[in-house]
């Protein structure tokens, strides 16, 4: 009897834990909405969601949280007549949800659903706070995104790395671009434009990226973190004695330099940056 009770308690704990990201999503859409749904996660090698009915509650079933969230969006749109928009992520659900008359299933063989590019982060997201990012991550899940680019805080990594390499704050500020231009900086097109950034900026960005990654991983979304392209400050040869090439100007902007082989730094610096 004790064994059976223990198993039941463990199963209940798993169910509660599995449902929590979706519960949070539903509560952000409409307070109290999570009590109107039954959320079920089942194992499957195929990404899918199902809509079903149990008594007066709508069942949304899927193989992972992103699939289930996509099912939530499908139900709201096609059964409840609710259209969530990019600028309107809340709604008032009916007191009694429209029933699902027969089980409906949707699946995809598209394993990876990618989102964003570097320009998006500067055009649109440069000054987003956590409140706005929380909505965006919900939006991703509702639309089946599971592989978004996640570059918030790349400037923090570079700030820390260059500090370790002996660069002064003024020198670092001449290299790292301002928020609205970091997309082009990270694509090796310019240095320092739109800066300098205040010290508080880097602290905020580090905290924000940790919040973003935590929420993405709660959903099962896999963030795409930036790798290392060989970019270094334009003065890395004089400042650090590195073997670099000068790519010239981009639309009149001075570009960062590129590390060139042979140099032991070409293998050590990427590891150093990624670990930061």
Describe the residue ranges of each PLM region.
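Aromatic-lined carbohydrate-binding surfaces of glycoside hydrolases
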Residues: 41-45, 54-65, 79-80, 90-91, ...
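Short, structured interface segments
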Residues: 72, 79-100
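Composition- and surface-driven signal marking solvent-exposed, interaction-prone regions
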Residues: 4-6, 74, 227
């Amino acid at each position: 009897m004790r064994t059976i009770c223990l198993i039941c308690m463990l199963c209940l704990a798993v169910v509660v834990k599995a449902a929590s990201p979706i519960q949070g999503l539903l509560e952000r859409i409409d307070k109290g909405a999570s009590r109107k749904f039954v959320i079920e996660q089942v194992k499957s090698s195929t990404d899918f969601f199902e809509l079903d009915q149990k008594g007066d509650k709508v069942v949304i079933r899927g193989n992972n949280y992103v699939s289930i969230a996509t099912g939530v969006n499908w139900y709201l749109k096609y059964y409840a007549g609710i259209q969530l928009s990019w600028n309107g992520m809340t709604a008032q659900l009916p007191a009694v949800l429209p029933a699902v008359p027969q089980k409906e299933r949707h699946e995809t063989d598209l394993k990876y659903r990618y989102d964003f590019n570097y320009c998006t982060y500067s055009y649109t997201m440069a000054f987003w706070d956590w409140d706005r990012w929380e909505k965006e991550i919900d939006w991703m899940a509702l639309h089946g995104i599971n592989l978004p680019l996640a570059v918030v805080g790349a400037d923090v990594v570079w700030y820390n790395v260059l500090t370790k390499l002996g660069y002064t704050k003024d020198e670092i500020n001449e290299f790292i671009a301002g928020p609205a231009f970091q997309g082009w900086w990270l694509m090796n097109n310019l240095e320092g434009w739109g800066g300098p950034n205040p010290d508080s900026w880097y602290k905020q960005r580090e905290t924000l990226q940790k919040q973003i990654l935590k929420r993405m991983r709660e959903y099962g979304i896999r963030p795409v973190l930036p790798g290392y392209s060989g970019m270094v400050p334009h003065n890395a040869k004089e400042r650090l004695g590195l073997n670099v090439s000068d790519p010239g100007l981009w639309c009149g902007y001075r570009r960062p330099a590129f590390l060139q082989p042979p140099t032991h730094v070409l293998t050590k610096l990427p590891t150093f940056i990624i670990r930061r």
